Regions:
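Outer membrane pore-forming secretion/assembly proteins and partners of Gram-negative envelopes
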Residues: 1-162
């Protein structure tokens, strides 16, 4: 009976991973709107790496998924006056990679795809397999938007929700 009691333990509830995705447009012109305070350290880092002068938040997406499962979110980016394009952000799985502090979240099969402002040509794409420290912001990638003057930058942060 004691052996059965030790073995017959209900499984621990699955953890959830919450991911916040920020889609930024970088350009050579100074920004006209202030970005959220939590993104300021990321912008400072980006200005140290690239020559862009202004950054604009195009959209923020929030996903919550059971650990080890896939998720996707779609939306519309407004690049400017009458310049909208749809996007999709998805990943195959997100799971806790380590229990240390800070914890690391592994994101496998990350894919981002967005239309261009003009609608001409192929879509903008990013694919990655990344590890993100819980609560920290990670720049996943940058891709040019119809030339070198503007870029689309994907920044994300993730945390475990227990």
């Amino acid at each position: 009976e004691e052996v059965v009691r030790r073995i017959d333990v209900p499984p621990s509830p699955a953890r959830n991973i919450e991911m916040t995705v920020h889609l930024l447009q970088a350009s050579q012109q100074p920004a006209v709107a202030e970005l959220p305070a939590q993104l300021q350290p990321v912008i400072k880092q980006l200005k140290g790496v690239f020559t862009y002068q202004g950054f604009q938040l195009l959209d923020t997406a929030l996903l919550r998924v059971r650990e080890g499962r896939e998720a996707a979110v779609t939306g519309t980016l407004s690049y400017g006056k009458d310049q909208n394009a749809d996007y999709i952000f998805r990943f195959r799985s997100a799971r806790l990679g380590s229990e240390g502090q800070p914890r690391v979240i592994r994101i496998d099969g990350l894919q981002f795809e967005a239309g261009k402002p003009s609608g001409r040509g192929g879509p903008l794409r990013m694919n990655a397999e990344i590890d993100v420290r819980e609560g920290q912001y990670a720049v996943v990638g940058k891709t040019g938007i119809e030339g070198a003057d503007k870029a689309l930058i994907l920044v994300l942060t993730a945390k475990v929700v227990e």
